[in-house]
């Protein structure tokens, strides 16, 4: 069996690529190691889509419950620095949209279920078939020929290992906590982020539905703060009042707490032969700006554009040029975002008094300079597209 793109990983990005290419008449096959299980209903983990990512989903007919964010306030918890971002500053309806991870994943998986091989995975990629097709071997020993192999299988990408990509990674020494909460507020389209020595604390509205939660919390804490044996729940209970005081709101946790260690990673190259890394398979960053999934969609968009352009050309598709164009468009942009997030993490975790003063004045200063604010918002919203 042959196909244009074999996609390893039936997550959000892998299924999006399959759906987008299928709409454009390009054959795909998704290989997913997990079972085709019933849709998960858990409503805890959320992701934040920028306007461009939402537009990409709208274009392939994906609709899930959303919560709109029109205003974001960023606060230096150790000082008086504040910066406000508003959607009207970039002439958009909203700055971003919050969706439940499972809602989006289930919708995309359902759309692509007929093109997915479940409970299987790639174990070999053979580039020596001919100059156009490669051959992939699956765990069940079946072989498939494909023009491209797209690794969309997450930060521990099996495809990256099979193709011997060179990994770079670093540990932030932090743990992220996420849970949903009920918060009484006058404006359900506002989000807040507080930087302090008790962690980076983000509050965002969550989609309404058959649950009592109104908001989602994403809280990054230093591992040293929980190394004394305290549980995540105990640490949260002891420190939540600090953020309630800063934000002048009562936060009532509604769900269990999910937690995961924070690391970044990237690869020196995104392409090798017929193989390409996309989304979390290629890179991961600190979640403080909520941009991880949006970088994945930007990757997927660029890859799909190049494949569609190559596929629709009158001559035989130049697969090497297609992949090189994708890599040029995305690799440096993703690395810049990773380094930028690392910079902000180090600035806001610093206990140096001079740096504390500089960041305090810096936030307030940027808040008064419209063109700088507009630049940051445009970048985060996906409008600075390559």
Can you say where each PLM-predicted feature lies in the sequence?
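Conserved N-terminal helical subregion
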Residues: 52-59, 66-162, 170-178
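C-terminal helical "tail/cap" subdomain of flavin- and related membrane-associated enzymes
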Residues: 305-386
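Conserved FAD-binding catalytic core of PHBH/FMO-like flavoproteins
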Residues: 142, 147-249, 257
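Active-site flanking residues adjacent to catalytic metal/cofactor-binding acidic residues
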Residues: 8, 31, 152, 279, ...
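FAD/FMN-dependent oxidoreductases across multiple families
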Residues: 225-311, 316-318
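Glycine-rich FAD cofactor-binding loop and adjacent beta-loop-alpha segment at the N-terminus
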Residues: 4-6, 10-71
């Amino acid at each position: 069996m042959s196909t244009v793109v074999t996609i390893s990983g039936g997550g959000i990005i892998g299924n999006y690529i399959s759906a987008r290419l299928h709409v454009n008449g390009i054959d795909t096959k998704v290989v997913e190691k997990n079972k085709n299980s019933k849709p998960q209903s858990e409503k805890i983990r959320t992701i934040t889509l920028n306007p461009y990512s939402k537009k990409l989903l709208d274009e392939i007919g994906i609709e899930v419950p959303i919560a709109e964010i029109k205003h974001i306030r960023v606060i230096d918890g150790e000082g008086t620095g504040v910066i406000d971002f508003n959607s009207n500053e970039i002439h958009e309806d909203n700055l971003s949209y919050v969706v439940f991870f499972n809602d989006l994943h289930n919708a995309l998986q359902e759309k692509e279920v007929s093109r997915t091989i479940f409970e299987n995975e790639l174990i070999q990629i053979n580039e020596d078939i001919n100059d156009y097709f490669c051959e992939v071997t699956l765990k069940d020993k079946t072989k498939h020929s494909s023009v491209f192999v797209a690794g969309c299988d997450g930060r521990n990408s099996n495809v990256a290992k099979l193709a011997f990509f060179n990994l770079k990674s670093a540990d932030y020494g932090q743990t992220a906590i996420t849970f949903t909460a009920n918060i009484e507020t006058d404006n359900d389209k506002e989000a807040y982020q507080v930087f302090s020595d008790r962690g980076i604390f983000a509050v965002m509205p969550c989609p309404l539905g058959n649950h009592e939660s109104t908001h989602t919390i994403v809280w990054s804490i230093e591992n040293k703060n929980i190394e004394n044996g305290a549980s995540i729940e105990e640490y949260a209970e002891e420190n939540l009042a600090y953020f309630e005081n800063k934000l002048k709101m009562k936060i009532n946790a509604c769900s269990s707490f999910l937690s995961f260690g924070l690391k970044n990673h990237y690869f020196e190259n995104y392409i090798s032969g017929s193989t390409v890394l996309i989304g979390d398979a290629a890179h991961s960053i600190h979640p403080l700006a909520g941009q991880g999934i949006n970088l994945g969609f930007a990757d997927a968009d660029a890859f799909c554009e190049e494949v569609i352009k190559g596929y629709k050309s009158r001559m035989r598709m130049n697969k090497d040029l297609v992949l090189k164009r994708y890599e040029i468009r995305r690799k440096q942009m993703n690395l810049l975002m990773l380094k930028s997030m690392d910079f902000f993490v180090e600035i806001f975790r610093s206990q140096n008094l001079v740096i504390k003063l500089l960041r305090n004045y810096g936030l307030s200063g940027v808040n008064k300079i419209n063109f700088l604010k507009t630049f940051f918002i445009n970048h985060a919203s996906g409008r600075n597209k390559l």
